[in-house]
From Swiss-Prot:
One of its GO terms (cellular component) is host cell nucleus. It holds the Pfam family Herpes_UL52. It is found in: Host nucleus. Transmembrane segments: none annotated. Signal peptide: none annotated. The keyword Repeat does not apply. InterPro entries: HSV_PRIM. One of its GO terms (biological process) is DNA replication. Its EC number is 2.7.7.-. A zinc finger (CHC2-type) spans 804-842. Essential component of the helicase/primase complex. Unwinds the DNA at the replication forks and generates single-stranded DNA for both leading and lagging strand synthesis. The primase initiates primer synthesis and thereby produces large amount of short RNA primers on the lagging strand that the polymerase elongates using dNTPs. Associates with the helicase and the primase-associated factor to form the helicase-primase factor. This is DNA primase.
């Protein structure tokens, strides 16, 4: 059946209704595009609002071909009178289009009545059906803005999109047209009438290309499907073989598609699959199959495979700078944990300031003064400056206490009404924490990590007070001092929880064991001398906050027993001692180390599965704690929150993950986890420091605040542009104009007059009506800045602005400002012509862009 897509200049629904009722008005039917097929009938169709199975048009009435004589109207490009359509209507075929809809809506049975009467008495139903199902454009503007403004683009896109029932969008079909032919014909002006419009569509030379273009477009579509199927396969192969977190997985997919479909590659692919006149129509789009997916391997996948494989990651990306020397002369804390001697001092901020001022005064002429306050105290603690008096060394820190021979820790302690700072080099840690009694009743045999953790009963307290000695063992925080070497890596690990997460004891301990396995393997690559079976990693978990707990504690044997009832996050503190004799200098290496550990936690398949099931893993290790003066809560200590009624809560309780080598002596491991010097950044060790790590770099993301995925994203989107002035000079030289300009201003004006303006003017003459184009016959340019110029028209020796380029306003005055903007895009310039009009209809002086022209790409 011959199919005609038509339009009207009046409300199409009412025009169609009048034809169905055989009472046609004087309105006209305009055949826009026709698909011929030998038949006794002609089907008149409109585009539907929804397209099921890519069927984008549907019939609204059917005519007898012989009565209508459609070929006469097509050959003469004439509209069809509604009366002629009504007289040639095929009642039987047309009735079948509407009768079921009418009967289903009214609930009546079929009556023996002519269709025209049935239609007449159901006008509202038919009008509602037509307006609800079809698009009803009444001017050429809609077709031009939808399908394209040039003859070839309009017709080829419309024919393929409407008639071929292919799964291609309008945008995709337009891309196919550009690949099929470089010449898409003349511009069709948007202000043409419907009669002028069908004169173009029914007489166009592009009608001869419908069959070839449809064949090419189907082949291009198949090639695109095959290409993207292969690309998807390549992306999924890596995604399934690696163990990315959910967040990283999303980032990876975006980066992969953007890498494969980067502008240059996509343009090359389009050129490769463009229509080749030297090949038969059936052999188009067959060259270099899978080019996009194959390019992804070289540009991204081989890099990702190295970065997301633990062995390759450490070999290729991790660079560690070490200094080995038996005479390094650097030292960590000197801190005794079993001592009856009281050297701990507790001072407020004001008292510290006075103490530092006194220290500066006593050392005047001997030591350089330090800044009063906490920073000064930290500097004194780390300072090894001394004076020799009668063969005896007097250190600066001994002005604070005579027994402070080596660096001492500084703690922040929360009291009821204030913070206080404590420092010293000895305390009776085990006795005051009650650890001696705990160790006394511990079982000797190892049963399981879970049983061992449950067996520890710490002495507890609930209330905040102003007693320094009590609070020293409940709310203590260590203050980081980057001047002192780090002997333990202390990690603050927060795992944000999913809303539906259920954390059983088995899940939690499995997660901790896998975290230990992942981190100890990473530790082995950084410190090859360690024994992974015996090297400890100490875990602490913030106690669950049950103040807002709405759980039902009624016994239910079928209910899953939760080990953790936290709702927002799981807070873990992880301490990994460095090997004896090794230390890290400063906070920067620790930040990089935290990023590395963040990354390696995503590389283990089992760990990733658990983390993805209950948490939102990603950048979980906090890197903000490694700055001088920042503090972190020590294991076994409580949180304080004045809003919770001065109560202590959220204690860091020990989770014992015993390594294989300590299963036969688990009490020794527990003693190690109770040793405060294993829980402090700068804890005291037995062996002197002979190896110092002063720099750790992840070459994949050397910047502290960027992950590997973030860096890849920035590299994709942050295109490096050449300076506009440089591009202007290059264009002048390329086009054979000697740039003798003495300044950048002269170069810019020369470029616009000689190169830029002729191109813009040609665009205006070709695509704009005469009223607009004539305004630009004589112009001059005024430089605004290095990238913007204003255009003024010159007439009879006078300079003036322009009348509106968008509309003909009442009283159309010359008060519109017109500009040219230059924008660098890689190795080329884009020229943008824009204006501002004061009229309300033109958005009251807002920027209106009229054309944007990309100049040719310059060679490097």
């Amino acid at each position: 059946m011959t199919i005609v897509v038509f339009a009207t200049e009046y409300d199409a629904a009412n025009v169609i209704f009048s034809i169905l009722c055989r009472s046609p008005s004087e309105h006209l039917i305009f055949p826009i595009i026709v698909k011929y097929k030998p038949s006794n009938n002609v089907s008149f169709c409109l585009q539907t609002q929804k397209c099921k199975n890519s069927k984008r048009i549907d019939t609204v009435f059917v005519c007898h071909a012989e009565k209508l004589n459609l070929s006469h109207y097509i050959q003469t490009a004439s509209p069809i009178k509604a009366e002629d359509v009504a007289n040639s209507l095929n009642d039987k075929e047309t009735e079948s289009l509407y009768v079921d809809m009418i009967l289903s809506q009214t609930g009546k049975e079929r009556e023996d009545v002519e269709f025209k009467y049935m239609a007449y008495f159901h006008k509202s139903l038919i009008i509602k059906y037509l307006t609800g199902k079809f698009l009803l454009p009444t001017s050429p503007f809609w077709f031009l803005s939808t399908y394209g403004q040039t003859e070839g683009m309009l017709l080829l896109t419309m024919f393929y999109y409407l008639f071929e029932e292919q799964k291609s969008t309008i945008t995709t079909t337009k891309n196919y047209v550009q690949c099929f032919t470089e010449n898409t014909g003349n511009m069709v002006f948007t202000y043409s009438s419907m009669s002028e419009f069908i004169n173009i569509t029914l007489k166009s030379k592009f009608r001869k290309l419908f069959a070839d273009f449809s064949t090419y477009a189907r082949q291009k579509n198949l090639r695109d499907k095959e290409e993207f199927k292969h690309l998807d396969t390549q992306i999924n192969l890596f995604r399934k073989s690696s163990h990315l977190t959910n967040t990283f997985r999303v980032h990876y997919i975006y980066i992969a598609y953007n890498t494969a479909l980067e502008t240059t590659k996509f343009v090359n692919y389009c050129n490769l699959t463009s229509y080749d006149s030297n090949l038969p129509i059936g052999q188009q789009c067959q060259r270099n199959l899978h080019i996009l997916g194959n390019s992804l391997h070289e540009n991204l996948l081989c890099i990702m495979k190295q970065y997301f494989n633990a062995d390759c990651y450490f070999k290729t990306y991790i660079d560690i700078k070490r200094l080995k020397n038996p005479n390094l002369n650097v030292t960590e804390y000197e801190y005794a944990l079993v001592s009856k001697k009281k050297t701990i001092q507790a001072l407020t901020s004001e008292q510290i300031t006075r103490a530092i001022a006194k220290c500066n005064k006593n050392g005047e002429g001997l030591f350089s003064p330090v800044k009063p306050g906490l920073q000064g105290l930290l500097e004194i603690s780390a300072s090894d400056r001394y004076v020799q008096i009668q063969d005896k060394r007097i250190y600066r820190r001994q002005h604070l206490h005579k027994d402070y021979h080596r660096p001492f820790p500084v703690f922040r302690v929360q009291l009821l009404h204030k913070n206080i700072f404590c420092f010293g080099n000895s305390e009776d840690w085990y006795e005051n924490m009650g650890f001696n009694r705990i160790l006394q009743y511990l079982p000797d045999e190892y049963i399981s990590d879970e049983a061992l953790t449950r067996a520890i009963w710490l002495q507890d307290t609930h209330f905040l007070c102003d007693d320094v000695e009590k609070q020293f063992y409940t709310t203590r925080h260590e203050i980081f001092n980057e001047r002192i070497p780090v002997t333990n890596y202390i990690g603050d690990l927060d795992l944000p929880l999913q809303d539906t997460a259920t954390i059983t004891e088995e899940t939690f301990f499995s997660m901790c064991r896998l975290i230990r396995l992942t981190l100890i393997n990473a530790w082995k690559k950084i410190f090859p001398s360690i024994d992974t079976d015996t090297h400890p990693i100490f875990f602490f978990k913030t106690q669950c906050d049950t103040t807002n707990d709405t759980l039902d504690y009624t016994e239910d044997p079928t209910e899953i027993k939760q080990f953790c009832v936290c709702r927002k996050k799981i807070g873990l503190r992880i301490s990994i001692p460095l090997p004896n004799g090794t230390a890290i200098a400063g906070g920067e290496p620790l930040k990089q180390l935290s990023k590395i550990l963040n990354h390696v936690m995503c590389l283990d398949q089992e760990l990733s599965q658990i983390l993805n099931s209950i948490t939102f893993p990603g950048e979980c290790f906090d890197i903000g704690i490694y700055h001088t003066g920042h503090c972190i809560r020590i294991g076994y200590m409580y949180k304080t929150d004045m809003d919770k009624g001065k109560m202590l809560h959220g204690r860091l309780t020990p989770i014992f993950i015993v390594p294989e080598g300590y299963r036969n002596s688990c009490k020794t491991f527990i003693q190690m986890q109770m040793d405060l010097n294993n829980l402090l950044h700068h804890g005291t060790k037995k062996a002197p420091i002979e190896e110092l790590i002063y720099n750790i770099t992840d070459k994949g993301c050397p910047k502290e605040n960027l992950s590997f995925m973030d860096l890849k994203s920035r590299q994709l989107w942050n295109k490096v542009n050449i300076a506009t002035e440089t591009l202007i000079t290059k264009y002048l030289n390329t086009h054979g104009f000697n740039n003798n300009a003495t300044s950048a201003d002269d170069s810019l004006l020369s470029f616009i007059r000689l190169i830029g303006w002729p191109i813009i003017k040609t665009q205006l003459i070709t695509h704009y009506e005469t009223r607009i184009a004539q305004q630009f016959s004589q112009v001059t340019f005024i430089k605004i800045d290095s990238k913007n110029l204003q255009i003024k028209k010159t007439q009879f020796g006078r300079v003036s602005d322009f009348s509106c380029l968008n509309r003909q306003h009442r009283g159309n005055r010359d008060n519109v400002l017109v500009y040219i903007q230059l924008k660098a895009d890689g190795n080329r310039l884009i020229l943008i012509l824009w204006s501002t009009c004061f009229a309300t209809k033109c958005q009251s002086n807002s920027k209106q862009v009229h054309c944007s022209i990309a100049l040719e790409q310059l060679k490097n």
